């Protein structure tokens, strides 16, 4: 990247959420899938949708706003304003550009299908099994990020590769926030964390294609990339818990999934791509996550750095 691009990229950290928060900094694979996209949106929380291959879909709502902010406004000042926005119920900082403020107000609204009873069940499960879930976040989901080829390469050749442990620590904030009893409540922080991360992803989509070190035909962080990372978290966690015989009531299991469904929505994943059940999550994961897992030189180096 040019010096100007690096400065702009570094400046828009959305108040402390590092580039690639949630680990979704990934390069869209332009090659055809081994099998055509076939997962039906009828299995989603929306129950319907266009059924387009998520590799061809990004986040136009966020992208247009963030691109204009990066090109036309003082990003350092915006970042300073965003650092003051921490809790879900806080007013959006008045010093932000109007278009960005309007986007944040829109993006932080919980989806209409949010079920607070299910969210409570998810917290009960996390509280009960918190230790083992935390271990899985680190050693299953965290290590898995190094064998997602596009993600590993993108992180390795970005600032995330230079400060990988710091990046993991900041990504872990999302894992912590989602497990709190007030995650999506006014005094919680999860909604803010998700919206800031969504804005960072939009910034990456705008800036990386301008870099001479980035293939111009690749637009990073498609809906597919977000879904791959999403499945490396709740789907992978629940699969391991089930395999190990960790008990979970129906209320707890559905609640844990629901906390991540709401998270996915707030991160900008379209409702038509969010699985409505664990069964659908496993089916979708088989198509989007499992086929891409493979070692790379960059991923091996990141894994080595992570384990030191």
Regions found by a protein language model. Name each.
Residues 2-230, 234-308:
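Mature, function-bearing regions of proteins
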